[in-house]
Amino acid sequence: MPLMDVHWLIYVAFGAWLCSYVIHVLSSSSTVKVPVVGYRSVFEPTWLLRLRFVWEGGSIIGQGYNKFKDSIFQVRKLGTDIVIIPPNYIDEVRKLSQDKTRSVEPFINDFAGQYTRGMVFLQSDLQNRVIQQRLTPKLVSLTKVMKEELDYALTKEMPDMKNDEWVEVDISSIMVRLISRISARVFLGPEHCRNQEWLTTTAEYSESLFITGFILRVVPHILRPFIAPLLPSYRTLLRNVSSGRRVIGDIIRSQQGDGNEDILSWMRDAATGEEKQIDNIAQRMLILSLASIHTTAMTMTHAMYDLCACPEYIEPLRDEVKSVVGASGWDKTALNRFHKLDSFLKESQRFNPVFLLTFNRIYHQSMTLSDGTNIPSGTRIAVPSHAMLQDSAHVPGPTPPTEFDGFRYSKIRSDSNYAQKYLFSMTDSSNMAFGYGKYACPGRFYASNEMKLTLAILLLQFEFKLPDGKGRPRNITIDSDMIPDPRARLCVRKRSLRDE
C-alpha cells in the first residue's frame, strides 16, 4: 500500500475516533433522578440537545420553569448537566456551608480555567475579601473620583459632535471603554489608570477568554492540551496574561509605602502567603477587571437600548438627576438619591440579565434535600433567575411582569415601609440577578454606583435615540448568557444650553 494511502487511513481513523469520542462525551449525562427538559422527542440524542442549548438555552430553561415551577428539573448543556432549583428550595440550599458547595467553580469549568488562567480564584478568596472589606465601605468617598475619570473618558471615547448633529455610534463598544477607564481608576489609582497597555489588555483579555473557554468547552479534556495552542484566541490570551503581569509587576515595584486608595494596593495589603506573589495578584486583577468591565458594560448597553426604545423615561430621569445634583452637587449621597434611575436600571436588568442562571454551585458532598431528592457529589446546581423575573409571583407592583415599567420599583419605594427595599443592588429570593445569600456578587454595590453615575452623566450631557425606523435591538442568547446585540447602533448628539 502506498505511504500516502497509509497516512490517509490514519487521518480518517483518527477523525472517526475523535468524532465518536466527542459524541460519547456529549451523550453522557448525570445520575440525578429529576426530569430533564429540552428534548424534542424521545428519539433526540443527548449530544444534539446539548448543541441546541447553545442557541436555545433561554427557551429551554423557560420551558422547564413553566412546567416544573415548584419542583426540581435539569438541563443539559455543553460540558455539564445543571440541576435547576426552584425558588422554594433556595433558602434550604443557600444555607449549605462552603465546604459542600463552590460558587466560583462553575465559572472555572465553563471557561476552561486551567487554560484561561482562572484557577487562581480556586486557591483563595482574596479578591472577595478586598471587595467586601475595603472597596464597599469606601464607595461613598469614590463618587467624585469615579466622576472625574468618567468626565475624562467622555472626552476620549465619545465622537466629535457639532451643533445639532446626530452621530451614529457603537454604544456597546463605547460602554466597554468608558467602564474600562472608570474601573482602571478604582483598580490602579490616579497615577496608573490611564496606562494604555493595561486598558488594551483588559479589553482583549475578556474577549480572548470567552472565545477560548467556549471552544474548549466542546473539546474533550484529554485533547485540550493539544487543541488549545492551536487557537488564535488562546495565543492572544497568553499575550494578555503576560502583558497584565508586566503592568501590575511594574506598578507594584514602583509603589513606595502605603496609603494608596485603590484595589491593587488593598489587595497587596490583604494578601498572605502565596497570595503575595506578583503573578498571583496580577491574575486576580485581570479576572476582576473582566468581571467588573464586561458584565457592567453589557448591563449599561441594555439600559441604553431600553431608554431609546422607551424615550418617555428620558426627561423624568434627567429631571431627577438635575434636581439631586442641583441641590447638593455630586456629594457622597447623590447616587443614593437617584430613586427613579435606580429603578430603571433594575427593571432593565429584569428583562435583560447577563446571566439567565444564577446562584451557580457545584456540590462536593452528596446530600439529600427535604423532599428526598439526592444530590450526588459533583452535581452542579443553579436558579432560573431570569424565568423567575417573568413570573408575577416574583415581580412586585400592579404592572404585569410582561410589561416594561421603568419606575416599577421607585413607585413601591415611595412607601416608607419599602424605602430600603427593591434597590438595584439588593438581592432576595425573588430577585437573584446578582445572586443571593453569602455568595451574592460582592461587587454589586460598586457596579450599581458605577452604572448610576454613568447613566446620569450621559443624560445630562447627551441626547440619545434609535436610528430612524429601527426598534429596540434584539438580544442574543448564547448558552445561558444574554448579550446586547453588538451590531446595533444608537444616535447621539451633544446637549446645548438651549436644551436646559
Curated annotation (Swiss-Prot):
GO biological process, one term: secondary metabolic process
Phenotype upon gene inactivation: Impairs the production of gibberellins (GAs) and contains ent-kaurene as the only intermediate in the GA biosynthesis pathway.
Catalyzed reactions: ent-kaur-16-ene + 3 reduced [NADPH--hemoprotein reductase] + 3 O2 = ent-kaur-16-en-19-oate + 3 oxidized [NADPH--hemoprotein reductase] + 4 H2O + 4 H(+)
Subcellular location: Membrane
GO molecular function, one term: heme binding
A single GO cellular-component term on record: membrane
Cofactor: heme
Keywords: Glycoprotein, Heme, Iron, Membrane, Metal-binding, Monooxygenase, NADP, Oxidoreductase, Transmembrane, Transmembrane helix
Carbohydrate attachment residues: N240, N475
Transmembrane residue ranges: 6-26
EC number of the protein: 1.14.14.86
Induction remark: Highly expressed under conditions of Gibberellins (GAs) production, whereas the transcript level is very low in the growth phase.
UniProt cross-references to InterPro entries, sorted A to Z: Cyt_P450, Cyt_P450_E_grp-I, Cyt_P450_sf
The protein's role, per its UniProt record: Ent-kaurene oxidase; part of the gene cluster that mediates the biosynthesis of gibberellins (GAs), diterpenoids that may provide a selective advantage during infection of the preferred host plant, rice. Gibberellins (GAs) are diterpenoids and are synthesized via the mevalonate pathway. Biosynthesis of the major metabolite GA3 (gibberellic acid) from geranylgeranyl diphosphate (GGPP) requires 13 steps.
Family: Belongs to the cytochrome P450 family.
Name used for this protein in its record: Ent-kaurene oxidase P450-4
Organism: Gibberella fujikuroi (strain CBS 195.34 / IMI 58289 / NRRL A-6831)
